[in-house]
Amino acid sequence: MRIMIKGGVWKNTEDEILKAAVMKYGKNQWARISSLLVRKSAKQCKARWYEWLDPSIKKTEWTREEDEKLLHLAKLLPTQWRTIAPIVGRTPSQCLERYEKLLDAACTKDENYDAADDPRKLRPGEIDPNPEAKPARPDPVDMDEDEKEMLSEARARLANTRGKKAKRKAREKQLEEARRLASLQKRRELKAAGIDGRHRKRKRKGIDYNAEIPFEKRAPAGFYDTADEDRPADQVKFPTTIEELEGKRRADVEAHLRKQDVARNKIAQRQDAPAAILQANKLNDPEVVRKRSKLMLPPPQISDHELEEIAKMGYASDLLAENEELTEGSAATRALLANYSQTPRQGMTPMRTPQRTPAGKGDAIMMEAENLARLRDSQTPLLGGENPELHPSDFTGVTPRKKEIQTPNPMLTPSMTPGGAGLTPRIGLTPSRDGSSFSMTPKGTPFRDELHINEDMDMHESAKLERQRREEARRSLRSGLTGLPQPKNEYQIVAQPPPEESEEPEEKIEEDMSDRIAREKAEEEARQQALLKKRSKVLQRDLPRPPAASLAVIRNSLLSADGDKSSVVPPTPIEVADKMVREELLQLLEHDNAKYPLDDKAEKKKGAKNRTNRSASQVLAIDDFDENELQEADKMIKEEGKFLCVSMGHENKTLDDFVEAHNTCVNDLMYFPTRSAYELSSVAGNADKVAAFQEEMENVRKKMEEDEKKAEHMKAKYKTYTKGHERRAETVWTQIEATLKQAEIGGTEVECFKALKRQEEMAASFRKKNLQEEVIKQKETESKLQTRYGNMLAMVEKAEEIMVGFRAQALKKQEDVEDSHKLKEAKLATGEEEDIAIAMEASA
C-alpha cells in the first residue's frame, strides 16, 4: 500500500490549479480546493495563497522606510509577526525572513560569526520547513501519471462553471418541455380521430394568469387612429447554440477589444500622427510609470548677508588674480609666498556650502539591527553581568521618528565644533594632551592669515601660559624655516660685450603685417612643439588621465607600500629605486593635473582668469630637463625594456599577447572603499568585493540620476523650442483634415449627381413614350365624350320642347277650371238671394 505524505515544494501546475480554484470556490472552501490537489492539504493551500499567490502581496525589494519600521516594531512587539505584518505591509514570513537577514548583516562585523554555520540554510537532503513562501518549481517536460491525472481531473471540474444545481434545473426544464410536447401531440391525435377529450379547467382560488390579464384596462369605445399601432411584430430570437446560451468568453472579448485598440491606433496614426506619437511618449514617460517622491528640501542655513560677504571675498581674490604684476616671479618665489586664493589651511572650516546634506553617523538600519542582535544574544538578568552596549534608540511611538534633514551652515559650523587639536590653533588657551598645540572653538568664521600679519598679540595673565605661547611661536618658526626648499638656481652676472659698429648700416625694411603674423604664428607653433616635447608621454599622446578626485586614492596606494615595511631592516637598492620612481610618478601626476587639468564641465564653465590663477598658484615645481636628457632617458628605458624581455623570456611574444595580459591585469583591478585603494579582486575577500560592488552601484546610480536630470532638462528645452511648431502643425493638420473632408464630400456628391444623370437619361425616353400614349388615349376619350355631350344636348332640347307643350296645356286647363268655378259661385249667389226674399215674405 502506497502512503502519500502531503506537502513539499509547490509546482507551477499546482499554483495554476490553486488560483483557478480560488477564483471559482472563493477563499473559504479550502477543503474543496485541496481536493483538486492530490499532494497538498487544505491548510497548505490556504498558507500558499496567503503567503505567495495573493495579488495583494508585495514581492518587491524592501525599502529603507520598511526596514526601519520593521526593526522598530520588532523592538516593541517581539515575536508578534502577525501583528507587525499588516503595519509594515508584508506577510509574516517575509517580515521574519527580512528581520533575520538584517540581524545576520549586523552580525557579520563580529569576528566569531561564520555565515556557513547559519542553521537556516538548507543542507543537502534537508526539507524546506516553509515551502509555501518560496517560488514555484518549473514543470518538468515529462510529468508522471499522477500529475497528469490530477491535471485532467482539475480541468474537468473547473470547466463546470455553472455547478450541479444549474445542471439539475436545466434537466428538469427539458423534461417539462418534453412532457408538454407529448401531451399536446396526444390531444391533436385524439382530436383528429374524432374523440373530443376536452380539457377541464381547474378552478383556481386566485387569478388565472393564463386566461386573464391582471390589472387590464380596456380601451374606451369609439374610433381612433391605429396607424401607429399597426407595426409588424418583432421576431424574438432565442439562443439556439451553446455559445449563445453561455455568452462570449472572456478571452474572446479581450481579443476583440485588443483588435479594436490596434485598429483604433492605426487609424489615429494614419489620421493624426503627431497626436499618436505624443500619446505614445506620454505612456512611455518614466514620470508616469514611476511615481516621483516628494522633494524634501532642508531650510536655508545661510542668510543673504553672509552670502554677500562670501561673494565679496571671492570677487576680491579674482581681482588679485587678474593683476599680472602680483603673479610674476619664479616658482621658488611663489613657493615661499602664501596663496590666498586656495582653501584655508587644514583644520579650518570651509567657506563653501557642501554640495549635498551629509548623511548621519553610520547606518540607522544597521544600528537598530545591531541593537536587536545584542539584545537577542544577551543573558538573562538573573545571571548578572554587564548590559550590552546599545546605540541610541527611542521607544516614543509605534513607527520610528523622522529625523529632520538640515544642510550645515559653513558660517556657523566653527562655533558649533568642539575644540580639539585638529581645529584652528589659538594661543593662550588650554593646551592639548600632547602639549604640542592649543585649540578652542572659534567664535566665528576665521580669516586666512598665512603670513601671520594679523597675529593676535593678546597677553595672558599667567606667566606660564605666556611662556608656552612664546615657545610655541619659536617652535613653529623653527619648523617653518627647516621646511624651506634648497636653492635650485645659481645666479651669475656676465657683462655683454659692446656691439660692434658697422661701417655701412643696413637699411631697415619695414616688415609686412601678413609676414609678421605668419612669423609669429610659426614661432608660437615651434614654441608649443618644444614645450610639448618636454611634457610627459601621457600628455603628448593625449592618453586618459586620472581625475583630480582620485589623486588622494592614488597617493595612498603608491605610498602604502612604504608604510607596511619595517623601519629596522634597511631597504635594498631596488626598493629605494622603486620608492623614488613612485614618488616621481606621484609628483608628475599632481603637476600634470594642476597645470593641464581635464576639460570637464566645471573647467569649461570657469573663465580663463581662474585657470591662470590656478596654474600660477597650485602648480608644483618639477625638474626642468633638456631635450637631450629626455632622449637619453627614453633610450635607457627602451634598453631596460629589451633587457627585461630577454631575461623574462618574452622576446617571442607578440603585441596581442601583451595587450591581453595588460587587459587581464586591468580587469582584475578593483577599488575597495574599505581600504581606500585599488587592489586585485582575485585575492580579495567576499566582504571587500561586496563593498566594492556597492560603491560602484552607488556611483552608477548617481550617474543615472545626473543623466535623468539632463534628459529632463533637454526634454523641457525641446518642448520650449518645438511648442510653437507643434501648435502650428496641429492647426495646419486640422485645416488639412477639413479640406480633405470637404473634398471627399464633394467627390461623393459629384458621383451621386452623375449616377442620377445616367438614370434620368435612361428613364427619359420611356417616360416620354408613356406620356405620348396617354395623350393619344386622352384625345380619343375626349372625342367620345364630346360626341356624347352633343347627343345629350339634343335630348335636353327635345325634352325642353316637350315640357313647353305640357306647360301650355296645363295653363289652358287651369283657365278652364277657374271659369267653371266662377260660374258655380255666380249660381250659388243667385240662389241665396231668392231664398232670402222668400223668407222675408213669409215673416211678413
Swiss-Prot record:
UniProt domain HTH myb-type: residue ranges: 2-57, 58-107
Family recorded in the similarity comment: Belongs to the CEF1 family.
Localisation per UniProt entry: Nucleus
Compositionally biased tracts (Acidic residues): 500-513
Annotated GO MF terms: DNA binding; DNA-binding transcription factor activity
Disruption phenotype: Accelerated cell death. Enhanced susceptibility to virulent and avirulent pathogens.
UniProt DNA-binding region: 30-53, 81-103
PANTHER family: CELL DIVISION CYCLE 5-LIKE PROTEIN (PTHR45885:SF1)
Chief location bin: nucleus
Self-association and partners: Component of the multiprotein assembly MOS4-associated complex (MAC) at least composed of MOS4, CDC5, PRL1 and PRP19. Interacts with PRL1, MOS4 and PRP19A. Associated with the spliceosome.
Chain's role: Component of the MAC complex that probably regulates defense responses through transcriptional control and thereby is essential for plant innate immunity. Possesses a sequence specific DNA sequence 'CTCAGCG' binding activity. Involved in mRNA splicing and cell cycle control. May also play a role in the response to DNA damage.
GO cellular component: extracellular region; Prp19 complex; spliceosomal complex
Positions in coiled-coil regions: 145-189, 685-723
Protein's UniProt name: Cell division cycle 5-like protein
InterPro entries assigned: CDC5L/Cef1, Cdc5p/Cef1_C, Homeodomain-like_sf, Myb_dom, SANT/Myb, SANT_CDC5L_II
Name of a matching Pfam family: Myb_Cef
Biological processes annotated in GO: defense response to bacterium; defense response to fungus; DNA repair; innate immune response; mRNA splicing, via spliceosome; regulation of DNA-templated transcription
UniProt biased composition (Basic and acidic residues): 113-126, 446-475
Modified residues (Phosphothreonine): 343
Tissue expression from the record: Expressed extensively in shoot and root meristems.
Entry keyword set: Activator, Cell cycle, Coiled coil, DNA damage, DNA repair, DNA-binding, Immunity, Innate immunity, mRNA processing, mRNA splicing, Nucleus, Phosphoprotein, Plant defense, Repeat, Spliceosome, Transcription, Transcription regulation
Keyword Electron transport: no
Comp. bias intervals (Polar residues): 406-416, 433-442
Span list, region Disordered: 113-147, 379-514
Gene name in the database record: CDC5
